[in-house]
Amino acid sequence: MHCPFCSATDTKVIDSRLVSDGHQVRRRRQCLACSERFTTFESAELVMPKVIKSNGNREPFDEDKLSGGLYRSLEKRPVSADLVELALNTIKSKLRATGEREVPSEMIGNFVMDQLKELDKVAYIRFASVYRSFEDIKEFGEEIAKLEK
């Protein structure tokens, strides 16, 4: 690790601790040349699978798109940002856990619906109505009935 103050290459770690639910390590370092202290963060570089769209196109996983869909569904609902972030991390972990290089967009949609069902039933119905393209009020009623079981 290069010192950001003097660019020396010799540093020592003074303190290490886990942050971000154990997905990142925060390290306090001290330069052996100039004695300045600085903080670094370490995390594993995890590759997300490509997404196979319903029309057959393949595109890179877009975390902003996933996040936007969740936040849109939860708009004006009493769910904290921390819970939304936890849901996003859960979805991404499930996608990586498949071990696949490519996953169908349908799988991502189902993971999102599973998380929304736990977070907020109204947000779940909002998302499901768009994701499953509800055509009439009857389909809404059927989905609500499934939730009540």
From Swiss-Prot:
Cysteine disulfide links: none
Cofactor dependency: Zn(2+)
Keyword ATP-binding applies: yes
ATP-cone domain mapped to chain residues: 49-139
Cofactor, how bound (note): Binds 1 zinc ion.
GO terms classed as biological process: negative regulation of DNA-templated transcription
One Pfam family per UniProt: Zn_ribbon_NrdR
Record's keyword annotation contains Amino-acid biosynthesis: no
GO molecular function, one term: zinc ion binding
Keywords of this entry: ATP-binding, DNA-binding, Metal-binding, Nucleotide-binding, Repressor, Transcription, Transcription regulation, Zinc, Zinc-finger
Zinc fingers (unnamed), renumbered ranges: 3-34
Family to which the UniProt record says this protein belongs: Belongs to the NrdR family.
PANTHER family (UniProt xref): TRANSCRIPTIONAL REPRESSOR NRDR
Function: Negatively regulates transcription of bacterial ribonucleotide reductase nrd genes and operons by binding to NrdR-boxes.
Protein name, as recorded: Transcriptional repressor NrdR
Annotated source species: Aliivibrio salmonicida (strain LFI1238) (Vibrio salmonicida (strain LFI1238))
